């Protein structure tokens, strides 16, 4: 059977792929960021919502530190666990799937599953509903 990573030989020679095994490969940081930028540029993004939700980004755009909210999201926001658009959860599914969140709501730590998702759940990689995809 052919090595599925054989085509990566040239990437390794260029120093972009650092290490590989049968299931994983480690890539150079800037190479990873450039690959992620391509993927992140294609996801649903709401510029007005993002700038409203994140006033620090809005100010950075006004000061021309970044060219747009989308540019900020692709370059920084994703890695800071910021949401690219408003994402509404299925409350019932979310609380059934994450009983620790339901317990936190009962204890008064969060008002709702939606509040949890927006404050920490998105950053923790929790899904807002079954089969969610960007």
Model-derived regions, located:
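Charge-rich, low-complexity intrinsically disordered regions
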Residues: 2-134
């Amino acid at each position: 059977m052919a090595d599925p990573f054989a085509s990566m030989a040239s990437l390794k020679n260029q120093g972009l792929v650092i290490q590989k095994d049968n299931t994983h490969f480690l890539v150079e940081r800037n190479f990873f960021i450039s690959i992620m930028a391509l993927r992140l540029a294609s996801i649903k993004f709401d510029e007005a919502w993002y700038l409203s939700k994140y006033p620090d980004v809005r100010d950075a755009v006004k000061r021309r530190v970044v060219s747009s909210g989308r540019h900020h999201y692709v370059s920084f926001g994703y890695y800071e666990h910021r949401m690219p658009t408003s994402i509404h959860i299925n409350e019932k599914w979310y609380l059934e799937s994450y009983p620790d969140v339901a317990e936190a709501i009962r204890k008064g730590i969060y008002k709702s599953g939606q509040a949890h998702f927006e404050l920490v759940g998105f950053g923790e990689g929790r899904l807002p509903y079954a089969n969610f995809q960007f």
